[in-house]
């Protein structure tokens, strides 16, 4: 049986080496996030201040995988 993962939204607060980021979730938890392979292959830039969707394992709630970068509402893309 496949493990159930929780999906949260959060804000990137700090960029760390090797594609790791410090993410503050909407429930004020601070976790370590790494970039998923699909985002890495698509060359999507993630910077501090970006809002992201992050997938957190139910076994280890201190680490998660960044699966989506949300668009900013105030940008003129």
Curated annotation (Swiss-Prot):
A GO term, aspect molecular function: translation initiation factor activity
A Pfam family matched in the record: eIF-1a
Protein name: Translation initiation factor IF-1, chloroplastic
SMART domains membership: S1
Originating species: Drimys granadensis
Main localization, broad class: plastid
Entry function: One of the essential components for the initiation of protein synthesis. Stabilizes the binding of IF-2 and IF-3 on the 30S subunit to which N-formylmethionyl-tRNA(fMet) subsequently binds. Helps modulate mRNA selection, yielding the 30S pre-initiation complex (PIC). Upon addition of the 50S ribosomal subunit IF-1, IF-2 and IF-3 are released leaving the mature 70S translation initiation complex.
Location(s) in or outside the cell: Plastid, Chloroplast
């Amino acid at each position: 049986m496949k493990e159930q993962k929780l999906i949260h939204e959060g804000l990137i607060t700090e960029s760390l080496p090797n594609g790791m980021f410090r993410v503050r979730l909407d429930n004020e938890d601070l976790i370590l996030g790494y970039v998923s392979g699909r985002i890495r292959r698509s060359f999507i830039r993630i910077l501090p201040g970006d809002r992201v969707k992050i997938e957190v394992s139910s076994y280890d709630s201190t680490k998660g995988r960044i699966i989506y970068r949300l668009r900013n509402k105030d940008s003129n893309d």
